[in-house]
Regions:
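Short beta-strand-to-loop acidic/aromatic patch adjacent to the donor-nucleotide binding site
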Residues: 139-153
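Short, acidic, metal-binding catalytic loop of nucleotide-sugar glycosyltransferases
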Residues: 69-87
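Active-site-proximal specificity loops/subdomain of glycosyltransferases
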Residues: 96-142
Length: 293
């Protein structure tokens, strides 16, 4: 019963509209059905867990502006290079390599093997699966997988925080910023404070898919990539309560740790408008902690 209550209260804080927390469907039933399986993996976390970013890159043919795509990716990678803890690796998977040198040995480009090439096909998850197969073949170990969109920017202490607090489950970034070009307009995104009446909740996880780190373990007896596969294709606003139902409750990153860039012309839905001006405190926080902005 505690698991169900924890899931419910998680949804009250994180669902954009609170009454959605009362809904229950096939996805929730599926997670509950897998809980016993996820409780059967007992390998302890290693002394040197790997942190691997998976970056699916849109094709040149599908991109609205390939030059902008590459510029944004470069900023994303610069934020990784600026991490205070250097123990990470990034795998970029796409049809086309970016138009700049990948001059850090921790960053690898993986040519996407597209068996049914079409310009408009949604191929993000195929690219992620190719990355995972590559990890199976080249990185037999345990650690964390983090899907990072090629236009999002991480706080410089993020990797350090995760590797200082390793656990066998999931990390979630629920606090961060939506940021428009120029760095002055945006929104602070965070869970609803249940002690205050606020109808709409804008969490980072609800807005941005780059919000989750999943533990993996390819050692003998390990859970392999099962946790990632159970969660990654679900709505990213649901990662938190679904992980609870799996019996793998996540760890909240306690500080605003991600910037979700908008209005650059390559990831926007129709009708998105310029967000309001950020407070002076938020602009300073971004300047102090996101070293490439």
């Amino acid at each position: 019963m505690t698991v169900y209550l924890d899931s419910f209260f998680s949804r009250l804080k994180t669902e954009r509209l609170p009454w959605r927390g009362f809904s229950w469907g096939s996805v929730e039933n599926e997670m509950v059905g897998m809980r016993d399986e996820f409780g059967s993996f007992s390998n302890p976390i290693s002394n040197d867990p790997k942190y691997i970013f998976l970056i699916p890159l849109i094709s040149r043919a599908k991109a609205k502006d390939w030059i902008v795509v590459c510029q944004l990716l470069k900023v994303t990678l610069e934020a990784l290079v600026s991490q205070s803890n250097p123990n990470w690796k990034a795998i970029i998977c796409g049809q086309n390599s970016p138009d700049f040198e990948l001059n850090d040995c921790r960053v690898e480009f993986l040519k996407f093997q597209d068996h049914e090439p079409t310009t408009n096909k949604f191929d993000k998850f195929e690219k992620l699966e190719q990355c995972i197969q590559h990890i199976k073949e080249t990185h037999p170990a345990d650690g964390f997988l983090h899907v990072l969109d090629a236009d999002d920017v991480l706080h410089k202490e993020f990797v350090s925080f995760v590797l200082r607090h390793p656990n066998l489950n999931v990390f979630i970034i629920n606090k961060g910023f939506m940021l428009a070009p120029g760095g002055r307009n945006g929104r602070y995104l965070a869970p609803r404070d249940v002690t205050k009446f606020r109808l709409v909740s804008d969490t980072l996880a609800d807005s941005c898919g780059s919000c989750m780190s999943c533990y993996f373990d390819t050692r003998e007896g390990g859970l392999e990539f099962k946790l990632f596969h159970a969660l990654a294709k679900q709505s990213h606003g649901w990662f938190e309560h679904l992980a609870i139902l799996l019996g793998r409750p996540l760890v909240q990153v306690p500080f605003p740790a991600l910037i979700y860039n908008v209005l650059h012309g390559n990831n926007d839905y129709g009708g998105r408008v310029q967000p309001p001006q950020l407070s002076v405190e938020h602009v300073k926080y971004i300047s102090d902690n996101f070293t490439t902005l």
